[in-house]
């Protein structure tokens, strides 16, 4: 690398000899003059000051032995390693005046000029290939990566700098060195976001060398397995977007969806998180931060960028011998002189921050690797507040850099500009000591260049509030702040920062991830009200103001005011001169625009037929007038039929039914009309499509669209299973889309295109006849009984709305997403709002089964209503009842669905009863849902403001045939969603024998022995009971606001806990009076044995759903019935009742009741405190004599029926269920008195 222009090159050989003789005479006089100016000052090696301890000799010997065994084989043995004996010298004290004389001595400047001439003879060749360096994990890796040199020389000893301090020999250089002793080199180092390092000429921007690294500066990995709020494990923190600023310790930013805050500056850096914060575990939300730090150091040859040394925690590598270059290898081949501009020592620090939830699920992994100076030079770095020569280089958001010379205040034009593949993250000024010897190889100092200072306070504020967010090619997010990168103020504003984006999509979950990424790229503006503080998202602790931002502000305010944007041309003359070049650039950009090229090519392909016909017309007729009718009719009909062929025929799942030469036949059929007499029937069957095209004018498009719809139905129909004459479905041995389809004759050709004209067909003379024929097409019976035939006109696609007869689909409004490419859009059907479920054609069988089951079951208020189905192109569209939200939406985001959430909280038993009622309706039709979860339960509000729950998503439903009570699991893997499936499905899914599982595995009081041979019914086959198990999970989810009984500390252990039967119902205790009934019901529904679970009607009859009035009436009826039993000896009914007394009363119930209530009891009859019969009698008597109680006692026991019932159930929570089970055990549930208590509550 050259430090001065090539014109100052080496002299000739004769001149060199004269100079050598002159120097030989002059040197003694220079030494004498120097001795007269100041006392002799011993030179001290800088490296010895860095810690030359007595162990250095041992270290050098060890390095010699290591290098001898690990050096590259092509290195000469004498050049492998050269151990230099270090002798520590003492430094004499010098006064400040002497120091000034030494620093400004004429010898320094003369030696500097000599150094300029010396380096000028070795310009860096542009053809030199960039070095690719992969930062190794071990020391031996560097030997294979270091570039080979054609000329090698022995290792030179370390060079030292003269001391600039008057301190003693033990003084630290950090306390002695001054930045005034240094000058900037003629090149700068540029570190880009992709991790590479460039060296460029400081004044011209010419590229000198390039060091490639395989690791980018920023890596952000987000773990988003749940992409929708409909997922059961959705948490807002999972959707935070983290970004790292690639400058000054890695400032951390986070974009928080649905918070209104947008992009937030956390006030933390990667360095701070790793070194001071991590490990950190928070509680709200439960998030854990961990971090680690890895440092490496490399020494580069300043002239070539080659790696000389590498030091890391795993080892080190020294390849200095390979960097030696002879100054003139062609002329002085025998010389051993090495030429070098010096060496550069750079540190690379890698920070890794792991962010996980406390349940072990990862949220994000952030990595930041920054180039930085040697920490030993921190004393100079702390003094470096402004560029030494007032030259500044800064980068735009697109990777273009600008260089400014601020030594002249009136000149605001950039010196040069250069474009890099990625933005420049950091700029490093390279400095060398003023007093470096001419022949020395000094260690250059790298200092990060301060940012360009702001022009005024308003500019400082704009910088502080502006953040540019972007992604690398690998999808990692990084941020560029206006403080560190002033030119990002000219970057485009991010779409998401505008209000109009959120007008289209209010919820973060409704935005497509790709669209969200595009919307986030651009400039974001921090809240100006909060810009003075640094905000921590809910996952981070509140901390002090980060030094990162303070330093940037100080760097901006302490320097001279300069402009912060790329300046415009100062005069109109310069603008006029630039017009020709600007116009040429615009034309070149326009012509080379890939979008324009793609558009032109697409237009040519799309209009190929029209262009051919036009060319043929002009060749044949010469004018357009002669052939105008033929041209218009043929093009219109041909275009629509062409669209139909492309949109419908490829969607057919039966490639066997379409010959390879089909397109050729269709093409020929549009130009050749040759038919035999025996084909007249086929012509009549298809004639309407051709006749309509042949007779209608271009303005009459409705008939063409009608024919298009009929054609679509004819094509879609054969894909469904066929039915025989009696309507019975034959047994399917293969899927419907294999082989011959639905009884349709296996024709080699397809129906001819609608744009044909037929000479043998009778022409339609009027439009009315054409319309009449088109209408008659709809009278033909559809071959697919599960697809509704639509007779209305097929509308064209206008914008994002697709009209298909009665169905309109707005593809811009996405309501939800499912598996296998299923998307739910907003739409309309016959004027009412509907949800349109779009499925790919590959899942035709699933859609057909779903619609058949929907038709059978939608006549119920708690089952989703089905409207219609239509096929278009490669998709099937199913119109369903549209709901406001799913149950998961309401539970997880009550703030977004406040009205629904409030309505549901008022009557939780009613909500759960409706869900059970819908499942009971399906079970009554012998339909098993198999995928019951909160996401598949939808919520709407009735006109009276009450919530209405609907069971939806019948894609995995299974209908049991007559006399069938069970079925096997799905081949390959059991149906359902992970975490919401019954244990018998999991066991069948694993292919395990339940009896082979360890039956001794248990945990807590809720353990179910999986090894019980009765745990599975029908030899491991599933029944309706799998829906009851999932329903129990839904019950717990609703009553606990989103919890899962099988989490047991870790969500990822759900299915393991389901297999083992480990669940926890303690969170239900928060329900108060209803807690015991809720626990009993859910525990019965979560039984491992399907036979032990109640059916849907038994669930609906459980006392949990009873009103307080019904509960109190039941207890009084039980007391009345038992009072009639014989007491001496006690009847079996009394024995059964009193058997449960100890666990219900737990002692003496009279001691539990209040004193005034017990005193009021004594007026009627005597009571025994340990008798359950007496407790029921007391409850019944005071209920019947409630009006006889005093006002104070009424206030004590509460009002009827709610307060009075709670007075007893709070003290005796097991009372109601115990009596309910006693009556059942006595078989009284069939009597007239108790029958209503064992039938569905009918809420």
From Swiss-Prot:
MF annotations from Gene Ontology: ATP binding; metal ion binding; protein serine/threonine kinase activity; RNA endonuclease activity; unfolded protein binding
Biased composition (Low complexity): 163-172, 650-660
Recorded superkingdom: Eukaryota
Ranges for domain KEN: 1108-1240
Keywords: ATP-binding, Endoplasmic reticulum, Glycoprotein, Hydrolase, Kinase, Magnesium, Membrane, Metal-binding, Nucleotide-binding, Serine/threonine-protein kinase, Signal, Transferase, Transmembrane, Transmembrane helix
Signal peptide: 1-35
Listed PROSITE patterns: KEN, PROTEIN_KINASE_ATP, PROTEIN_KINASE_DOM, PROTEIN_KINASE_ST
Chain residues that bind ATP: 815-823, 837
One family name in Pfam for this protein: Ribonuc_2-5A
Cofactor(s) listed in the protein's UniProt record: Mg(2+)
EC numbers: 2.7.11.1, 3.1.26.-
Role this protein plays: Senses unfolded proteins in the lumen of the endoplasmic reticulum via its N-terminal domain which leads to enzyme auto-activation. The active endoribonuclease domain splices precursor mRNAs to produce their mature form which then induces transcription of UPR target genes.
Protein name: Serine/threonine-protein kinase/endoribonuclease IRE1
Record gene name: IRE1
């Amino acid at each position: 690398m050259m430090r001065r222009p090539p014109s100052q090159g080496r002299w000739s050989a004769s001149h060199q000899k004269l100079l050598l003789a002159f120097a030989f005479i002059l040197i003694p006089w220079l030494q004498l003059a120097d001795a007269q100016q100041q006392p002799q000052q011993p030179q001290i090696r800088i490296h010895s000051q860095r810690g030359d301890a007595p162990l250095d000799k041992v270290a050098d010997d060890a390095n010699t032995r290591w290098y001898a065994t690990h050096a590259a084989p092509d290195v000469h043995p004498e050049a492998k390693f050269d151990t230099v004996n270090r002798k520590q010298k003492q430094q004499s004290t010098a006064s400040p005046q002497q120091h000034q004389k030494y620093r400004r001595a004429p010898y320094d400047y003369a030696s500097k000029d000599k150094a300029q001439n010396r380096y000028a003879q070795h310009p860096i060749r542009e053809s030199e290939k960039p070095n690719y360096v992969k930062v190794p994990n071990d020391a031996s890796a560097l030997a294979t990566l270091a570039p080979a040199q054609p000329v090698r020389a022995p290792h030179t000893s370390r060079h030292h700098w003269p001391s600039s301090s008057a301190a003693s020999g033990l003084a630290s250089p950090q306390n002695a060195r001054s930045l005034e002793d240094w000058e900037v080199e003629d090149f700068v180092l540029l570190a880009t976001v992709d991790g590479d390092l460039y060296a460029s000429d400081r004044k011209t921007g010419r590229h000198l060398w390039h060091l490639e690294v395989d690791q980018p500066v920023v890596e952000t990995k987000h773990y988003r397995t749940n992409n929708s709020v409909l997922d059961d494990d959705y948490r807002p923190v999972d959707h935070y977007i983290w970004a790292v600023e690639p400058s000054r310790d890695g400032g951390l930013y986070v974009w928080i969806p649905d918070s209104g805050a947008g992009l937030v500056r956390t006030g933390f850096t990667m360095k701070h998180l790793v070194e001071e914060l991590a490990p950190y575990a928070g509680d709200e939300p439960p998030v854990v931060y961990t971090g680690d730090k890895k440092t490496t150091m490399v020494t580069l040859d300043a002239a070539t960028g080659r790696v000389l040394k590498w030091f890391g925690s795993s080892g080190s590598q020294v390849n200095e011998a390979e960097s030696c270059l002879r100054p003139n290898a062609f002329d002085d081949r025998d010389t051993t002189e090495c030429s070098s501009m010096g060496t550069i020592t750079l540190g690379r620090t890698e920070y890794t921050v792991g962010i996980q939830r406390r349940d072990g699920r990862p949220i994000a992994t952030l990595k930041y690797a920054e180039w930085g100076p040697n920490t030993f030079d921190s004393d100079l770095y702390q003094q470096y507040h402004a560029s030494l020569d007032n030259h500044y280089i800064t980068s735009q958001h697109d990777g273009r850099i600008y260089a400014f010379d601020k030594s002249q205040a009136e000149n605001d034009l950039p010196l040069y500009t250069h474009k890099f593949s990625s933005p420049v993250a950091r700029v490093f000024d390279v400095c060398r000591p003023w007093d470096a010897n001419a022949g020395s190889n000094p260690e250059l100092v790298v200092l990060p260049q301060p940012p360009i200072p702001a022009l005024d306070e308003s500019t400082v504020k704009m910088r502080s509030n502006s953040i540019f967010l972007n992604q690398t090619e690998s999808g990692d997010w990084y941020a560029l702040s206006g403080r560190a990168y002033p030119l990002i103020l000219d970057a485009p504003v991010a779409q998401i920062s505008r209000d109009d984006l959120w007008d289209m999509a209010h919820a973060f979950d409704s935005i497509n991830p790709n669209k969200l990424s595009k919307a986030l790229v651009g400039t974001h503006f921090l809240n100006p009200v909060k810009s003075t503080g640094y905000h921590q998202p809910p996952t981070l602790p509140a901390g002090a103001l980060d030094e990162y931002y303070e330093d940037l502000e100080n760097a901006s305010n302490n320097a001279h005011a300069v402009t912060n944007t790329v300046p415009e041309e100062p005069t109109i003359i310069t603008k006029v001169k630039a017009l020709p070049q600007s116009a040429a650039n615009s034309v070149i950009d326009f012509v080379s625009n890939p979008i324009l090229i793609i558009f032109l090519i697409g237009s040519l392909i799309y209009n190929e037929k029209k262009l051919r016909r036009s060319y043929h017309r002009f060749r044949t007729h010469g004018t357009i007038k002669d052939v105008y009718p033929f041209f218009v009719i043929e093009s219109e009909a041909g275009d629509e039929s062409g669209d139909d062929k492309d949109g419908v025929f490829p969607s057919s799942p039966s490639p066997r039914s379409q010959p390879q030469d089909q397109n050729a036949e269709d093409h020929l059929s549009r130009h050749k009309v040759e038919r035999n007499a025996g084909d007249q029937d086929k012509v009549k069957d298809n004639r309407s499509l051709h006749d309509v095209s042949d007779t209608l004018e271009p303005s009459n498009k409705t008939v063409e669209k009608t024919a298009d719809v009929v054609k679509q139905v004819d094509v879609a129909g054969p894909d469904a299973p066929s039915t025989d004459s009696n309507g019975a479905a034959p047994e399917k041995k293969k899927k419907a889309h294999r082989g011959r389809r639905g009884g349709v004759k296996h024709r080699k050709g397809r129906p001819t295109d609608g744009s044909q004209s037929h000479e043998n067909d009778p022409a339609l003379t009027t439009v009315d006849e054409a319309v009449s024929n088109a209408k008659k097409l709809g009278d033909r019976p559809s071959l697919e009984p599960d697809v509704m035939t639509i007779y209305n006109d097929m509308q064209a696609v206008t914008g994002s709305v697709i009209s298909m007869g009665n169905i309109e689909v707005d593809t811009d409004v996405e309501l939800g997403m499912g598996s296998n490419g299923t998307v739910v859009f907003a739409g309309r059907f016959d004027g009412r709002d509907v949800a349109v479920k779009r499925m790919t054609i590959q899942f035709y069988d699933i859609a057909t089964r779903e619609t058949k089951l929907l038709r059978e079951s939608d006549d119920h208020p708690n089952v989703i209503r089905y409207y219609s189905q239509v096929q278009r192109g490669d998709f099937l569209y199913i119109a369903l009842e549209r709901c406001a939200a799913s149950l998961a939406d309401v539970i997880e985001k009550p703030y977004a669905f406040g009205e629904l959430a409030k309505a549901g909280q008022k009557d939780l038993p009613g909500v759960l009863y409706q869900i059970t009622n819908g499942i009971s309706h399906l079970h009554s039709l012998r339909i098993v849902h198999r995928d019951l979860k909160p996401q598949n339960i939808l919520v709407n509000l009735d006109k009276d403001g009450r919530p209405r729950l609907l069971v939806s998503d019948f894609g995995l439903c299974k209908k049991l045939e007559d006399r069938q009570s069970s079925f096997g699991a799905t081949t390959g893997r059991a149906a359902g969603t992970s975490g919401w499936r019954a244990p018998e499905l999991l066991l069948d899914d694993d292919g395990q024998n339940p009896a082979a599982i360890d039956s001794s595995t248990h945990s807590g009081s809720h353990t179910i022995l999986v090894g019980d041979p009765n745990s599975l019914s029908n030899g491991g086959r599933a029944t309706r009971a799998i829906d009851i198990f999932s329903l129990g999970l839904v019950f717990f989810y609703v009553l606990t606001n989103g919890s899962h009984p099988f989490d047991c500390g870790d969500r990822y252990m759900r299915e393991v806990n389901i297999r083992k039967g480990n669940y926890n119902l303690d969170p239900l205790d928060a329900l108060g009076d209803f807690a015991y009934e809720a626990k009993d019901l859910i525990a019965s529904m979560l039984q491992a044995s399907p036979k032990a679970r109640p059916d849907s009607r038994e669930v609906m009859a459980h006392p949990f759903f009873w009103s307080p009035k019904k509960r109190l009436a039941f207890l009084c009826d039980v007391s009345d019935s038992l009072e009639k039993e014989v007491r001496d000896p006690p009847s079996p009914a009394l024995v059964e009742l009193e058997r449960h007394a100890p666990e219900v009363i737990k002692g003496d119930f009279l001691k539990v009741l209040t004193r005034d209530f017990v005193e009021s009891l004594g007026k009627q009859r005597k009571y025994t405190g340990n008798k359950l019969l007496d407790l029921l009698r007391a409850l019944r008597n005071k209920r019947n004599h409630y009006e006889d109680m005093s006002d104070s006692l009424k206030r004590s026991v509460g009002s009827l029926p709610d307060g009075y019932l709670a007075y007893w159930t709070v003290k005796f929570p097991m009372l109601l269920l115990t009596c309910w089970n006693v009556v059942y055990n006595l078989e009284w549930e069939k009597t007239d008195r108790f029958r209503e208590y064992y039938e569905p509550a009918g809420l």
